[in-house]
Amino acid sequence: MTMDEQQSQAVAPVYVGGFLARYDQSPDEAELLLPRDVVEHWLHAQGQGQPSLSVALPLNINHDDTAVVGHVAAMQSVRDGLFCLGCVTSPRFLEIVRRASEKSELVSRGPVSPLQPDKVVEFLSGSYAGLSLSSRRCDDVEAATSLSGSETTPFKHVALCSVGRRRGTLAVYGRDPEWVTQRFPDLTAADRDGLRAQWQRCGSTAVDASGDPFRSDSYGLLGNSVDALYIRERLPKLRYDKQLVGVTERESYVKASVSPEAACDIKAASAERSGDSRSQAATPAAGARVPSSSPSPPVEPPSPVQPPALPASPSVLPAESPPSLSPSEPAEAASMSHPLSAAVPAATAPPGATVAGASPAVSSLAWPHDGVYLPKDAFFSLLGASRSAVPVMYPGAVAAPPSASPAPLPLPSYPASYGAPVVGYDQLAARHFADYVDPHYPGWGRRYEPAPSLHPSYPVPPPPSPAYYRRRDSPGGMDEPPSGWERYDGGHRGQSQKQHRHGGSGGHNKRRKETAAASSSSSDEDLSFPGEAEHGRARKRLKSHVNSDGGSGGHAGSNQQQQQRYDELRDAIHELKRDLFAARQSSTLLSAALPSAASSSPTTTTVCTPTGELTSGGGETPTALLSGGAKVAERAQAGVVNASCRLATASGSEAATAGPSTAGSSSCPASVVLAAAAAQAAAASQSPPKDMVDLNRRIFVAALNKLE
């Protein structure tokens, strides 16, 4: 077909036929229902007494009034539904369809073999595969006849769409209206005759061909195509409509049964087209002579044994044959870029040439084209069959088996400046993931295996270090004794030390938590008195860090250091007690000079001595003690407390000078005890606490007396 014939065929009218409604299929929506009585009544009313249309309805794209592409040539109510036959006559629309069909891969595949290729018809069959009727919404005859005026027009137009909302509305395109009606087996001969009479009579009422009714453009058609992509289950509906109408029993251009995956697989078709173009370029024209490089006539080669030909089938594509070569050209020119192709010229020779000494079966073996995919076993079988021809063609030649080449030898190891060998990354990877032993440096061992013996040039490694200690807390706490450290055995170095520190052994961690909870209890808080700087704050008592395990073998030195620290505290406390005892003695001496007696003060204690052991010089003792007690009284009234033992020493010396009878007697006679009680009561009544510090001091003295 020439170019002019193709263009004239492209602008020729295209007929489309199909059902607008099926009476045996109930629609999903009530507004789409078209009963048979209503349809026949509308046809009689609009056809002026005839069951057909008197005025041609417009035919558009997706109910777009600006995209009118033709008219409805016939419409008739048949046994199964309302049938329609339309005619596409818009030149602009047909030209757009022709240009778009040239870019479509689905259209390039062509129709079924008995049909003639027609790109315009195939494009319309794939893009607008459904028919849709625009009519009034009526459910019965009474509602249809109740309207008046312009609303009495039952049908408005018929649209070409991607898929119809009513079931069974599949569109069939063709160049001949008679051929289109024959695609539907549900139409009887009488139905076809009535449709034929309508389209022949509708020629005078068709749209004027001089004025193109299509006022849209390619952008509007592209927008409609995008909308069609979002139709849910479009292909299953088209397949159902195709089976319902019965188009599957006859050949047509309908693409409803073609899946998108099969439509996009055009590799075989492109290989077929490329093979045809190569064969046409290699085959000389009729009457042309092939030039020869040698003056001698060419020798006709013997015909090789050819494999049996495959039966012709539209689904089987012929394999691409290599380009034919002239007899003067060498056979190596047709070899493929394969490692074994240079050694197997018989397998790569063209089908029309043979090699001397080769068997017919081997000489007929040809490499397939790139579009054929072979399994691995079949590929190596072909290589094995071609390898048998190598000794025949080249005596003494040995074909290499298709096995993996041996691994290259590793690079030698060179000693570095510090004496250790330089090892590459490949050697390290081989040691970890393969059975590789470096002959130059056997000191490296594989992971998860015991290391081999060291090189004799290396010195003997030192023995393992003994058990060491590791601190539990940060290194900042240097004042903590070694008893708070954790001991790690040298034999367990293979395990992680952090595992021991952070809960590796559950018993040790539990004991640490219990010790911390016991130390944080409120019962261990020390006492504080009002007026002190730390009153109201919880103060912890000093505790000795005793080994929780009960053992004392490794903590003897630490306990000794702790005992020394606590001995110093005990000495300080004892010194304070001696000072307080001296203060009480001075207050006792001061009370002897006071004549009045009162009740004993709660802050003083009486010293019990035998009453029968009284000295003869008892009258001189208060007088002798009064001179030393005057200074103490003055200091007591001034709020000064002497925290030393001088008063007790002075009183003892004065008592010694008073007479020999008092030096050998008891430390406190009965008169002195009574006088001390009276003096303390008078001092307590006469000198009240001056400030809070004095009050706290007296309370602290009373507390120490209770402890004693």
UniProtKB/Swiss-Prot annotation:
It comes from Human cytomegalovirus (strain AD169). Its EC number is 3.4.21.97. GO terms for molecular function: identical protein binding; serine-type endopeptidase activity. Belongs to the herpesviridae capsid scaffolding protein family. Changing D227N: 1300-fold reduced catalytic efficiency. Residues 269-339, 455-565, 593-619 are annotated as: Disordered. The active site is at H63, S132, H157. The gene is UL80. InterPro entries: Herpes_virus_sf (IPR035443), Peptidase_S21 (IPR001847). Changing L229R: 1800-fold reduced catalytic efficiency. Residues 294-311 have a biased composition (Pro residues). Residues 688-708 are annotated as: Interaction with major capsid protein. This is Capsid scaffolding protein. One of its GO terms (cellular component) is host cell nucleus.
